[in-house]
Amino acid sequence: MGKKKRKQEHEKERGILLEGEVVEALPNGMFRVKLETGQEVLAHIAGKLRVNFIRILPGDKVKVELSPYDLTRGRIVYRL
């Protein structure tokens, strides 16, 4: 598979990036996040945050990447 094709597939998989606030910490690295739009989503921690032991607590501001397929689920990619 060429670089161009891989890049196109990676761009297609990217979700919508929004900011929000962690409302509740759930088991297994899951969090309930209230987005700036007012919507509440269920989000899990991205692998890089988990590997680097970035702590996320209720009340933290975070960037969430929403899945284009299911807008009620997302991935926390950055803690602000």
Swiss-Prot record:
Protein encoded by which gene: infA
Keyword field contains Transferase: no
Function recorded in the entry: One of the essential components for the initiation of protein synthesis. Stabilizes the binding of IF-2 and IF-3 on the 30S subunit to which N-formylmethionyl-tRNA(fMet) subsequently binds. Helps modulate mRNA selection, yielding the 30S pre-initiation complex (PIC). Upon addition of the 50S ribosomal subunit IF-1, IF-2 and IF-3 are released leaving the mature 70S translation initiation complex.
Segments forming domain S1-like: 6-80
Keywords recorded for this protein, A-Z: Cytoplasm, Initiation factor, Protein biosynthesis, RNA-binding, rRNA-binding
GO molecular function terms noted in the UniProt entry: ribosome binding; rRNA binding; translation initiation factor activity
Source taxon at top rank: Bacteria
Subunit structure: Component of the 30S ribosomal translation pre-initiation complex which assembles on the 30S ribosome in the order IF-2 and IF-3, IF-1 and N-formylmethionyl-tRNA(fMet); mRNA recruitment can occur at any time during PIC assembly.
Protein name as it appears in the record: Translation initiation factor IF-1
Coiled-coil residue spans: none
Cell location: Cytoplasm
Gene3D superfamilies (UniProt xref): Nucleic acid-binding proteins
Pfam families listed in its UniProt record: eIF-1a
InterPro entries the record matches: NA-bd_OB-fold, RNA-binding_domain_S1_IF1, S1_domain, TIF_IF1
Membrane-spanning segments: none
Main localization category: cytoplasm
Organism annotation: Aquifex aeolicus (strain VF5)
GO CC annotation terms, alphabetical: cytosol
Family, as annotated: Belongs to the IF-1 family.
